[in-house]
Structures are given as C-alpha cells and as structure tokens.
Amino acid sequence: MIKKYEYDLCGKKIEVTIGKVAEQANGACLIQSGETVLLVTAVGSKEPREGVDFFPLTCDFEEKLYSVGKIPGGFIKREGRPSEKATLTARLIDRPLRPLFPEGYHNDVQVIATALSVDQDNTPDILAMIGSSIALSISDIPFLGPTGSVAVGMIDGEFIINPTKEQREKSDLELTVAGTKDAIMMVEAGCNNITEQQVLKAILRAHEEIKKICEFIESIQKECGKPKQEFIQPEKNIELDEEVKSFCIEDLKKITVNEDKLDREDHINTLKRSVVDYFVEKYDESIASKVSTIYDDLEKSEVRRLILEDYIRPDNRKLDQIREITCDVDILPRPHGSGLFKRGQTQVLSVTTLGTPSDAQVLDGLIEQEDKRYMHQYNFPPYSVGDARPLRSPGRREIGHGALAERALLPVIPSEEEFPYTIRVVSEVLSSNGSSSQASVCGSTLSLLDAGVPIKEPVAGIAMGLIKEDDNVVILSDIQGLEDHLGDMDFKVAGTKDGITALQMDIKITGISEEILTEALERARVGRLHILSLMNECISEPNKEISKYAPRIMVINIAPEKVREVIGPGGKVINKIIDETGVKIDTEDDGKITVAGENTESAQRAIDMIKEIVREPEIGEKYLGRVTKIMNFGAFVEILPGKEGLLHISNIAHERTNKVEDVLKENDEIMVKLMDIDDQGKMTLSRKALLPKPERKEKKNFDKKSEDQNSEDK
C-alpha cells in the first residue's frame, strides 16, 4: 500500500512517499522538497558478521547527473567514483545514526540515498539525512531513533532554517545539526567568524525544529513501521570477567598513565598478550577472543574511571591542559610556503602552493559549476601512527578532515581582487596522537603566512572531549587519540581570536545537553586563544614578499568587447604574446585578464602588449607602424596590433612617388601620423606629414632663368 505524508518545515513542504518503490529493502522512502527528490533505502543482514567487534554500518550518497539534466563526461559516459561532496554527505548521514544502534549489534546495515532530481534551492543533503532516519525507522532493523536534521543560515543576525541558494550566498553561517527529540547528536558548521553565543543559539534553534521532525517521523513509523527484529545482547560470562579483572587490574592501573603514547601502547599490549596466554593455557584456545575483549573493556573502564573520579588523564595532564606546542615556518626551500606544527605527539607539515586562476578546481556536479580557488587537502600516511600498510587513495576520513580544515580557513582567505592567486594547501600528518585535523588548521595558518598570503587573521583549532557516566560529566581540552577512542565526544572547534570559523561535533552516546555544549565551547575558546598566542610568537603577519619561485601575477581590466581582439582569430594573437613572453594568460568574458609570469618583467611585457592591442587609435597621434601589404595605390600599415590604416601613395613623401615599392617594402617599420577615421572605422595615415618639407628649388631655378633672359634682351 502506498502512503503519502506531508510536513511543513518553516514554510517549505516536505513530501514523503512510502511503499511505492524499492519494496525488497527493509525500509525505503521517496522524500521530496521543491523539485529535489531522493530515494533512500535501508537494508540489514539477518545474521551478525563473523569475527568483528564493531558495528558494520555503511552509508552512501549517490549523485546521479540525470537528476540535474547532465550527461557524465569522459569516454564511458557513466558516473564514476563519488565526488568529494558526495563523500561528505555520506558522512553527514552516517554520524548521527551510528550511536543509535544497540550495543553489540554486529549485523551489516547499509543506507543508500540516491539523488533522483535536484534543484538549486533544496539541497539533497538534509533530505538524505531525514530520509535515512525514516527508512531505518519504518524498517525492522533495531534502530533507536528517529533523528531529525536541519540546515541553519544567518543573515543580519537572523536565523534561517534550510536557506535557499540565494540566502546561502549571503549567510554568515552554514550549520548542519542532527539529533533526537531529547538531544543533539551531530554538528557541522562553517562560520564567518561568529561568536560562541551565536553558534550556540543557532544549534538550539535547530534543535527546536529537529524535535518536530522526529515527531513527524514517529507518526509515519506508527502507521508504516515493521516490527523490529529482536536483538538480544550476548550474555557476558560474569565469572570469567571477574577472573580476568582480578588477575590483571592492578598491573593495568600501573601502566594506564604514561606521557609517551608508544611506550604506553607497548606496555598495554605486552600485558594483554600475557593475560590472553595465561587464560588460553588455563582453559583452551577458544577463550582467547573473549579474554581479549574483556581486557579491552577493562582498559576502557580504567581510563574513564581515572578521569571521572581522580581527574587524571592517560598522559597525566590536567583536564584543561593543552599539550606542549612548537611552531616553525620556512622549512622547505622550493615550495611557496611551509609550516610545521607540533602539539604533543601530533605533528603536521602544511605546504602552500600559489597558482594562477586557471589552476582553480572546477566543481561540476549536482550544483551549478563554480571555480574553487582555495583548496586544502589532508593526508594521513601509515607511518604517522607507526603502521606498515599499503598506500591508498584518500578515504572518507581524509576527505572529511581536509574539508573541515578548508572550511576553517576559508573566511580569512583574501578575495581574488586582493590576492589573484589560486591557493592549494596540503597537510601531511607526520605523527598522530589525536587532533590531527585541528593541527592541520594551525599548520595551514603558519604555511599561508609564510607564503605571503594576506589572510585576514590567524586561525587555530582545538578538539574537545567528553567522558560521561550518568550525571558525572568531565570535559577534556585538547584530546589525544586514546581519549577520542575511549571517550564519548569529539568536538572540534576552529577560529580566530574573535570568533568561530568551523565546528564539528560527533558523539558516541545518545546526545548531549545545552549545558555541556556551552561549557565545551567556552573551554575551546580559551584553548584556542592560548594556541594562537604561541603561533603568533612564530609568525604573526604574512611575509611582505611571496616566494621567488611563485608566479608573478598581474591583472588588467579591458572593455569586454576587446577580449576577442586580445585572443585573435583561432587564438593567434594571445598565443603570440605567450610565445614571446613565456607567460600564462587567463581571460574572462567581463574583460578581466590575468597574466602570470615567472618574473615581473615577463608579466609586465605581456601586459604592455595587451595594452597596445586594446589601445584605441587617436587622430593626430604618431605611431611606429609596420607595412603589412603593398598596393598600387599605397600601402597598408599596422599601427597597433590588429589595427591597420591606409597610407596612400600621395601621402608617402612630399616628392612625387611613382611606385610604392621604390620607397617601401613589406615589414618595413615607419613612423606615420593618423590623419582621419571615417564612419566605418577606416583610418587614413600619412608619412609625409612627419617629414620635413623640402626647400623649394623650383623657385630658385625660375629666378635664375629670368635673369638670363633679361641679359639676353639687353
């Protein structure tokens, strides 16, 4: 049976259709707003996956170019690997759902959101998140939702729920929030340097709408929902738990706190092997995995107990203490800018490259095509955590971390008018013990300043953590890897001294309160200011000069109708400039021309040549022209690139010229004067006007003849 539901989200109608498509999926729905339509499905396996100790959830977002009336490029004309935007949307779907499955549930679950039709005002990401919650809620998969999701913009201090394309372009905030009726589950934001109070108000405003969306989904679930699969958590062997605990807990307590990550891991793993070996010998091999799991749970419990009860962190820091920080710049000779940022045992090298406008990344997917002139990419090689494994292309984590750091710096990147370069920053994680994405924010700032990029303000990032047991809550500043792994929250905040530029929150519990959010934001602000002060001691302002290896860019604006003259037929004119000067030239339809050369001299020479091309001839001006063609009646002379005038045979010299070839030949350079331009733009030139007038010998000869004649008469 097909059922349709409608929901009004702040003036925008959302339509949900159940039972029309994908009937073999555990749960499926069509969700529509405006002309954006998505199919969202949820499928779960009937049995748990063998040999895993994690929840195998996969969320995918499929961009179909037919949804915007496009045909894929390339030879095969088929959608390829997911775009960066699709990957980020898949992460948005995944993050609020993952904590809402029963502990110990190891069945495979796959959620797929497919964009079938997309308009520019109703972005598919929010619909995909809501549709995923609906598909899981009406399925028989044991999902503990529902969740709701909204986007929030801010224009002139006013919050806008699910802003349109035009509103997004004007907004100082790009916030995505997901949560349940009771708590916030996920936050993702890019901000134009706004305050913590404004961010918090926006999150709370979003949660008001999320509660209503959850109620809407619950009403659908009541009518269409399937009975949930019965999931019984595996019974614990209490006796074995106690036996393992009594055998190793005292030794575990002694080695839990250690400032050195690798040394701590060595001790923890050595003890674990001895514990497993002891019980395998005592019982049999089949018990090994159970003992290993019990040991891991003991380690987690001990770390959390120390923090909650004794306020002792695994590396012996105070709760709000930030690890030791070192900064360095200009460490690589050839790249255009470089910065090395180290916080504890996390170290990131960020490298900046300055390019021309044509180096900008062209984004052409479900959104309108646009150029991206600031790019940040994040790499996490295996050696950064002491692993030996094959190198692969960037995964979802790398793409997500790179996008977060990019978003953090974007508000301070100068406009193209101020700084006409394309900017690419690559952050290489050299060593990781947590907060590497925020270290890449700090490293990027150092690198950009070293490259001479006039960023508006330095940006720093910090990751906050949370340990929560019932009402006992502890917030941690600058979390390391273990605290991220065993804690309940990873809350990343980046910004300047004045406000927030990017935010990302992921939690592993069923939500956090307003009070926790408020305290976490304030603690992050204090930590961020501390980090910025240390970075400023290393470099506080952009270098006055860009690298000698960076291209020199000059910009000239000409009349739009003159662009074709600069390009010339088949690119003949522009290619000649490029060949003669060795520069790179980018033209735009609005008349903006960007010239990039290896040095200032070559770029300036190209600019001068362009000026000559677009220069308008003026009557009465003198020009050094080149003879392009000889005719019986005169010669055509090019006085400016692409601009020829007629030098009539009578205007070549004061004396009579019998044949043009007697005085001129092709490619001769001569000085001429522009005498006239007729209504059709044809130019009349004169060489004669610039030549000195000869003495009138004819008159002298006449006088002499007269004298001779008079003498004869006498």
UniProtKB/Swiss-Prot annotation:
Mg(2+) binds at D484, D490. Keywords: Cytoplasm, Magnesium, Metal-binding, Nucleotidyltransferase, RNA-binding, Transferase. Signal peptide: none annotated. Its cofactor is Mg(2+). Residues 551-610 form the KH domain. Residues 685-714 are annotated as: Disordered. Residues 693-714 have a biased composition (Basic and acidic residues). It is found in: Cytoplasm. One of its GO terms (biological process) is RNA processing. Residues 620-688 form the S1 motif domain. It catalyses: RNA(n+1) + phosphate = RNA(n) + a ribonucleoside 5'-diphosphate. Its EC number is 2.7.7.8. Belongs to the polyribonucleotide nucleotidyltransferase family. This is Polyribonucleotide nucleotidyltransferase. It comes from Finegoldia magna (strain ATCC 29328 / DSM 20472 / WAL 2508). The lineage of its organism: Bacteria, Bacillati, Bacillota, Tissierellia, Tissierellales.
